[in-house]
Amino acid sequence: MSDQQQPPVYKIALGIEYDGSKYYGWQRQNEVRSVQEKLEKALSQVANEPITVFCAGRTDAGVHGTGQVVHFETTALRKDAAWTLGVNANLPGDIAVRWVKTVPDDFHARFSATARRYRYIIYNHRLRPAVLSKGVTHFYEPLDAERMHRAAQCLLGENDFTSFRAVQCQSRTPWRNVMHINVTRHGPYVVVDIKANAFVHHMVRNIVGSLMEVGAHNQPESWIAELLAAKDRTLAAATAKAEGLYLVAVDYPDRYDLPKPPMGPLFLAD
């Protein structure tokens, strides 16, 4: 087939929401359930050709997403409703497409992203939850959210996050730029909201694990700054559980004009 006869290739971006509790993470892997595998299967059915997706952030086992962004290329020309309603009809109930947008050739869900934003939800109550048990992390000791917020502000800006980096992290550098980190209380829920250019492996969960020690008055407010300066993972607290973590937003240059739906999860406003 000559170049003139080649069908046009369309590049499509999707916003994806998922409950990660029954998946072994985002990334497709042999013999285990992954969000990527389910999404690619549904897209391939609608496109009637094999589809491979690329995501903004590969979330770990049990981690959720309300603002994941993916892109894929296809020769299939479909209406937006096919990529949303049609794909959703082929997806399991715990994964959904939130929006669709045709993007230019230079767009890449991961490499075009300028920042990622996560929210970590702690159910801070003496008794464990039942209904939202896989969507929040239960912590029974009373937490001082204002104390946690103050302690966290030392993490702003460009820093070496070795103390909050998983041992198995494959990133070439531990340096990341944190744009904001806020800790707020909403009734029995404590929310840690953090935005950075990128994250090292388990960075949010390791930060939250140590902040909970400060919030429970087991460590002084100055402890987080001391951990950051020490550059030693063994000094920090245990990694917080996956259940409470959500990828809520990914930032891109304005020229791509991607939709920005409410981040959530649940009752949380922007």
Curated annotation (Swiss-Prot):
Molecular function GO labels: protein homodimerization activity; pseudouridine synthase activity; tRNA binding; tRNA pseudouridine synthase activity; tRNA pseudouridine(38-40) synthase activity
Domain of life of the organism encoding this protein: Bacteria
Gene3D superfamilies: Pseudouridine synthase I, catalytic domain, C-terminal subdomain, Pseudouridine synthase I, catalytic domain, N-terminal subdomain
Site (Interaction with tRNA): R58, R78, R110, R126, F139
UniProt-reported outcome of changing R58A: Loss of activity
Residues the record lists as binding substrate: Y118
Record-given protein name: tRNA pseudouridine synthase A
Organism the protein comes from: Escherichia coli (strain K12)
Encoding gene (name): truA
